[in-house]
Design a protein with these regions (language model features):
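Broad phosphate/nucleotide-binding scaffolds in NTP-utilizing and phosphate-metabolizing enzymes
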Residues: 1-217, 235-262, 273, 281-382
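Catalytic-loop of the protein kinase fold
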Residues: 220-230
Length: 382
């Protein structure tokens, strides 16, 4: 794949596109999903030089042991297992790919040029806003000190939420290109063999993921994780937990967060209540409040946020998705709905696009579990 060969920024772009299930056809998104796990690896020597440059010290000054082979690599960084020299604690060390300092601005410029050229030749596919969003979010994601602050904040927020099996690795210290945190590991949420071999109920995992990410969207003052995909979530067997959830949900990669205004949270929640109640006048009212969607474009927007054919939205969005519905959506995309979606979402507030991005998680939890959580949420009584 060209994005994989061209390196970090383009892999990051591909990962972002893999999660755009609210906009792109499943066939496109599925093509980009392997980029969640296929990323470049920087040499140990280059990392040693980076640490020396950034801190004035060597890796051996911080760690008594440091595994040179990374246990994981992402588009912007890779993770090594190490042992802290002063405490003996086993930790995960997230280290930015050193060449990003030099190449990131050039790659961003090329991305903007490519999307601008695409708009010129295919004006109906204007996704220049995606390059703009990447240009805004990338500097934040490249600041690991900020990521450390984000992780600490979301860890503190969820410590007050009862019965949520969420684990956020504790941050020990952070620099702009180096992040040291406690070592926490698990398996991808779609590793069904692991779940089954440890008697982890798939529906319980679904329910936990639904609670966690919907809390981020609808919870008062909750921070919103804006890069949710299967590579950033891990499930770990934990028989010590009480109740039905005999597992932990580990959430990684806290580089990109947004705060949702309370008024938007409430209007978006009321939009979903209207969808579940099949109350079309209220759906249209709150669609305009959250995204300035007019009457003409509402059916398209309703399909985008629910992932369902609009005729289903008008009846009961909780009903099982039929083969006929899947074929209808596929046919509509081929008949120009994709171009209409691109143009529509280019006008939607950016924070709404980031909220919609959580739709990527729909492959990990059943829709009826989302509904069950949603109706019981405290925000509905606010």
């Amino acid at each position: 794949m060209a994005m994989e060969k061209n390196g970090s920024i383009f892999i990051k772009l591909g990962q972002h596109m893999s999660s755009m299930t609210y906009l792109l056809p499943n066939e496109w998104c599925d093509t980009f999903i392997p980029l969640q796990d296929k990323c470049p690896v920087s040499s140990y020597e280059s990392l040693e030089k980076m640490v020396q440059k950034d801190t004035g010290q060597s890796l051996s000054d911080f760690f008594s042991e440091f595994e040179q082979r990374p246990v994981g690599a992402a588009s912007l960084a890779q993770v090594h297992i190490a042992t802290l020299k002063d405490t003996g604690e086993r930790v995960a060390v997230k280290m930015q790919h050193p060449e990003l300092d030099e190449w990131a601005p050039l790659d961003l410029g090329l991305t903007r040029f490519t999307f601008a050229a695409l708009k010129r030749f295919f004006p109906e596919y204007d996704i220049t806003w995606l390059a703009e969003e990447l240009g805004k979010s990338l500097p934040e994601e490249l600041d690991f000190a900020q990521e450390g602050r984000n992780a600490t904040r979301v860890r503190e927020y969820f410590s007050k939420i009862k019965d949520t099996p969420l684990v956020i690795p504790r941050v020990i210290w952070a620099k702009r290109r180096i992040l040291v945190m406690e070592y926490q590991t698990g398996h991808r949420p779609d590793d069904l063999a692991y779940l089954d071999s440890h008697n982890i109920d798939r529906d319980e995992v679904s329910a936990a993921l639904a609670r966690i990410f919907n809390e981020m969207i609808f919870g008062k003052n909750a921070p919103l994780h804006c890069d949710p995909h299967g590579g950033n979530i891990a499930i770990r067997h934990n028989p010590k937990r009480r109740g039905k959830a005999n597992f932990d949900v580990i959430l990684y990669d806290h580089g990109l967060y947004r705060d949702i205004p309370l008024s938007l949270r409430r209007s978006y929640a009321k939009l979903w209540l209207a969808v579940l109640d099949v109350d079309e006048p209220r759906m249209r009212k709150y669609a305009y409040e959250v995204a300035r969607i007019d009457e003409e474009h509402f059916p398209l927007f309703a399909s985008a946020i629910t992932g369902r054919d609009y005729r289903v939205v008008q009846k009961n969005v909780a009903m099982a998705r039929s083969t006929e519905e899947k074929e209808a959506i596929s046919d509509a995309l081929g008949e120009g709905m994709l171009a209409d979606l691109v143009q529509l979402l280019a006008q939607v507030p950016r924070v709404m696009l980031l909220i919609l991005k959580t739709n990527d998680l729909s492959k990990f939890f059943r829709f009826e579990l989302f509904i069950l959580w949603f109706r019981d949420s405290e925000l509905m009584n606010a």
